[in-house]
Amino acid sequence: MKVLALGIFDGVHAGHQQIIKTAKHLGEVTVMTFDPHPTSVVAPERTPSQLISVKDRIELLKQAGATHVEVVNFNKDFSQLSSDQFIEDVLLGRFKAEHVVIGENFNFGFKAQGSPKYLSEVGPKYGFGVSIVKLQEERGSTISSTRIRSLIIDGEIERANELLTRRFYLKGPVVHGEKRGREIGYPTANLGLSPLSTIPADGVYAGWLSVGESRWAAAISIGTNPTFPGVRGRQVEAYAIDQVGLDLYDQEAKIEFGFRLRDTLKFDGLAPLLEQMKKDCDQARELTSK
C-alpha cells in the first residue's frame, strides 16, 4: 500500500518518529516534507530557526523508516491551494496516496483551513484511509520542534537531546577566527553557521567535534569572548581535547552537544581564564568518555 506521511519534521524528534512508525506498519512509506518552512512564506516575521538542514532531515527520516522522502517547495502558489485542491492535486494527483498519516496538529490548505478531522472525513470519499497520530508527551508537555528550539536556546541541551532521541548538533565550515585560542594553547574550530541555525544559549558545553571520519571529545564555547576587548558577534567554537596540530580550516565540521557545563564568565585576565578552561576540559573529557 502507498502510505504517505505528511509534516515539516524539523529535527525528526520522538513525535515525528512515531508518525513514521505508524505509517510503516501500514506499508511502504513516502514522507512528504516542505522547504522552506511554511511560516517563512505565510508569516515571514515569525520564521522559526532550523533544527537541522533539509539534507540532514531527509537522512534522519530515512533512518526513522521512510523509503522515500519528497521535499515539496512551499511557495506562495502552494500556500494558496485550497484544502480540496491540496487533496486532489497533491495527495492524489502527485503522490497517488492510498493511506495518509499525519500528526493531530497538521493543518493544510490555504490559511491552514484543512484540519485532521476534515481529512479523516473526506479521505474515504476520495478513496484513501487516514491515520491521525496523537502528539507525544514528555513530563506532561507535548514534544514539538517549537519546544525543542526553546530548550536549545535556553541551554537545556540534555532535555532537548532526550526529545530529539539523539544529540543536537550544528554543522558548518571551519572559518578563521581571531586565533585567540591558538595563542593561549587552546586552538578552537570556529564554526561558520547558516542564519537559520538554532544556536544554544551562551556558555560552555561538553560534546564532540567531527571532521570527515575523525571525531574527538570537545569543550565547546558559545558567546562573544567577553574576557577579551573589542566587540564581536556570537561565536560557536570547539576545542578538540588532547589533540595537537589539527588543521581544520575550510573543512565541514559537526559539533555535537552533550552537556552544558556553565555560563559564559568574564575573567580578570588570562590566568583565571586558563585555570577555568583546564577545569572545563577535564570535566568535558570525563563526561564524554562515559
Task: Provide a role label for each language-model segment.
Residues H13, L61, V100, A160, ...:
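Residue-level signal for inorganic ion chemistry
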Residues G123-T224:
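Glycine-rich, Lys/Arg-enriched anion-binding loops that position phosphate/diphosphate groups
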Residues Q18, D56, R159-R166, P272-Q283:
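A non-catalytic, amphipathic alpha-helix used as a structural packing/dimerization or gating element
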Residues G177-K290:
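Phosphate/ribose-recognition catalytic cores of enzymes acting on nucleotide-derived substrates
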Residues M1-E59:
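N-terminal catalytic cores of NTP/NDP-binding nucleotidyl/phosphoryl-transfer enzymes
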Residues S40-Y126:
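N-terminal Rossmann-like or analogous alpha/beta NTP/dinucleotide-binding catalytic cores
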